[in-house]
């Protein structure tokens, strides 16, 4: 019953989150900025060996001699791990961000302390799923500059990976120069000038390559996810550029202001209704309307559908098969912010409504069901728009 003062006085709660690991980019930054280079080395070796399973890496905290004896390679230099680690973090997170950009998920606070080394989605406080389609959407009302807006999320990943490379720069440069991993105490015993020289080496030989790795990995996963979601998976072969310029970018423009989840769920039925595109467009615009001004018109949607039909025709699959495949990857239900608000309000009432909580939890675990029952169907609607009730870092 203890009230907590945030934007308003609100009821306190204990929230337990579970993840395979809570290590994040910020853990490396913390030790690096303090000059705790042994901690940087031990942490890196731990992540490489225990989290990624790289058995050729010394186990964090293990002596060099013990590691060599265990591996049966006494006297042999241990292979570098730092550049591999950076690239692994980059690839894992790029694939996760690609799914965010496909499903309209907005994290809200993408600082380096909220980006997992495992590539999992963690610490998403003021998160949201996009309702009214707008690539400039912001889900955190503390983010007045739009730093973490939907369209900026990939950019913020590149920024975060840059900061990871900064934190590991002396290690990266040392490994590049010497062709082996650090020994215990070796970086700590080096001079400031040596560490700066190695850091400069790392920036020169690695940074641009890793940035390109983030971009190509993210775009490749993004194109695969979008073509799968749209039922045109075989068209993935035409390349990212055409998928982006001919289908996805025009989708965001044509469907502007319509609810993203409902629009894509309705598109699942389009393969069986391509004979009357104008009627289908009218139905979609009406059903996915989010009540925002200057939203997409029936003509906008119909024009996109005509182009989309040519892509579906190229699949050469029965309409029913396409529809079923699309419904397996296009959710009917997403956990919108107004739903979590309703759950909290019902639990805070004099007679806590735990049944409603359990119903929402069940729907979260089964988002692709049809949910035809009236009460469940209501939870699949736009409800209260995100922009009218945007959470903050303190929510």
What are these regions (language model features)?
Residues 2-107, 118-246:
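ATP-dependent phospho-/nucleotidyl transfer catalytic cores
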Residues 146-395:
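Regulatory N- and C-terminal appendages and interdomain linkers associated
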Residues 62-77, 105, 111, 299, ...:
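Polar low-complexity intrinsically disordered regions
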